[in-house]
Amino acid sequence: MFIKFEKVKKLLNMLQSMLEAGVHFGHQSRRWNPKMAPYIYEEKNGIHILDVVQTIGELEKARTAFKSAKNVIFVGTRPAIAPLIEQVATKTGSNYVNTRWVGGLLTNWTTMTMCLEKLGRLDAQLETATPKKGFTKKDILSLTRERERLEKFFGGLRNLKTLPDLVVIVGQPNERNAVLECQKLNIPTITLLDSNCDPTFVSYGIPANDDSARSVAFILDQLTKD
């Protein structure tokens, strides 16, 4: 009896934390994707409210998948979410994309590998690029600008040596290219599913508000916790 009480208490605490983080808030009902109907609890004042009881169950499935993955990319490029993507990737030793998903990042892996190798070479060059080594100020400036250009799009992927075995996506409607490339290559995805998302394009979908930084931070923390 005590064990059951503790489980119920833990569940209630989790639900309370989700509500405080605004995980349950979807979009205006006119902006929804009808495929999300099974995850909608109700419509209130023109806003869809997500069923956070289902969120808990789906989050647990996603957490299991995340723990078994060895090579993960976190994706989320909207300005409000980008810092969270870098933080969670750094915390978990994962790769990330938080500025722009470059088309062909996964499906054109050969070119992608060349870009990462070039970035690595530029890092090494700039560590020793001094006038004493024969580099002019113009040379150093040119190398620096080239590295900054590659860093902007590929800096979070420096440790990516092979195609990922899992991609975590925040903001599905904005990350369509990432979604389609993962689908084409049969790479599993974990996706936060707001009321305007398409659950048929995910391997593990977590019904949750993906616009609020607080909601996203909460879900990512729960997803990656030990």
Swiss-Prot record:
Keywords: Chloroplast, Plastid, Ribonucleoprotein, Ribosomal protein
KW Acetylation (keyword) present: no
Compartments, record wording: Plastid, Chloroplast
GO cellular component: chloroplast; mitochondrial small ribosomal subunit
Domain of life, source organism: Eukaryota
Keyword Ribosomal protein: yes
Gene Ontology annotations of biological process type: translation
PROSITE patterns assigned: RIBOSOMAL_S2_1 (PS00962), RIBOSOMAL_S2_2 (PS00963)
Entry-linked SUPFAM superfamilies: Ribosomal protein S2 (SSF52313)
A UniProt-annotated Pfam family: Ribosomal_S2
GO MF term list: structural constituent of ribosome
InterPro entries from the UniProt entry: Ribosomal_uS2, Ribosomal_uS2_bac/mit/plastid, Ribosomal_uS2_CS, Ribosomal_uS2_flav_dom_sf
HAMAP family, sorted: Ribosomal_uS2_B
Similarity section: Belongs to the universal ribosomal protein uS2 family.
Alphabetical list of NCBIfam families matching this protein: rpsB_bact
Name of protein: Small ribosomal subunit protein uS2c
Species name: Ostreococcus tauri
